[in-house]
């Protein structure tokens, strides 16, 4: 299947992309962000929310935000359990991951520094302990 579009701001000739996604109906659509309209967009358009954790932010805690997001989904007539929560920016710390699980996070994405192999390999080994 080929796509082509010629508009005022976007213009491309016929093209194709492979491999095609195996997820049906499509790969999960996650939205990051923490702004005032984020939850509106997550509830309307997305399969989940991906807040960047591990940095200070004012206002409600992550657990409180997850409750607010799920409540907003329910108010909009959407199954709150259909929203997946992915925490981005964590270090591989068992206590921190446990707190994320308690808060309602479904998946965590660890961050690794851009350093030499000798510095990063032990961190990858720590991350591997969380994969089951």
Regions found by a protein language model. Name each.
Residues 1-132:
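Active-site-adjacent structural elements that line small-molecule/cofactor binding pockets in enzymes
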């Amino acid at each position: 299947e080929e796509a082509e579009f010629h508009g005022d701001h976007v213009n491309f000739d016929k093209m194709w992309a492979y491999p095609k996604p195996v997820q049906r109906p499509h790969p999960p659509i996650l939205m990051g962000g923490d702004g005032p309209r984020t939850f509106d967009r997550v509830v309307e358009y997305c399969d989940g929310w991906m807040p960047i954790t591990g940095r200070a932010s004012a206002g409600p805690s992550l657990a409180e935000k997850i409750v607010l997001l799920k409540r907003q989904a329910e108010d909009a007539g959407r199954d709150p359990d259909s929203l997946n929560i992915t925490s981005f920016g964590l270090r591989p710390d068992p206590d921190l991951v446990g707190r994320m699980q308690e808060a309602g996070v479904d998946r965590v994405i660890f961050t690794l520094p851009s350093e030499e192999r000798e510095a990063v390999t032990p961190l990858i080994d720590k991350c591997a302990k969380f994969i089951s």
